[in-house]
């Protein structure tokens, strides 16, 4: 993958499995990706293709019967697959890495612009001013 840009998040050969009724279900098979600083990465796929499961691996939100069976996830030099405690994940989840879930009742407000909602999250988690990030949020909205 890319070596000449600032890689924020790197996932290599991720395999996610779930224990279901005395069987092992493989939900993610060998996914690799890189998130580059200043760029937007979109996960696109059919319902049930594993988008939400993959993003849950980046935030430590897999269900109790799930696990990362193979691969590595590096966030700015930190091995996320080595994190085990809820306290460790609290330092990452929401503050550094966040997910907008598909459930329309818990994700985006249909009466607000996407840009204003992205700005709200940036202000809450990064403590930046609204004016500074309004431009960045608009850029993100245009790229969706």
Predicted regions and their residues:
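ABC transporter nucleotide-binding domains
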Residues: 1-135
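Single conserved hydrophobic/aromatic residue that forms the stacking wall/gate
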Residues: 133-144
């Amino acid at each position: 993958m890319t070596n000449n840009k600032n890689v924020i998040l790197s996932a290599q050969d991720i395999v996610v499995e779930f224990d279901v009724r005395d069987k092992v279900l493989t939900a993610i098979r060998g996914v690799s990706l890189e998130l580059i600083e200043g760029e937007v990465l979109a996960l696109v796929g059919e319902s049930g293709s594993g988008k939400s499961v993959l993003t849950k691996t980046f935030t430590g939100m897999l269900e109790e019967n799930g696990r990362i069976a193979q691969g590595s996830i590096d966030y700015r030099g930190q091995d996320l697959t080595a994190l085990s405690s809820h306290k460790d994940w609290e330092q990452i989840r929401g503050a550094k890495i966040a997910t907008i879930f598909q459930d329309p009742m818990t994700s985006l407000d249909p009466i607000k612009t996407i840009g204003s909602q992205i700005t709200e999250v940036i202000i809450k988690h990064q403590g930046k001013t609204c004016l500074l990030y309004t431009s960045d949020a608009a850029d993100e909205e245009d790229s969706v």
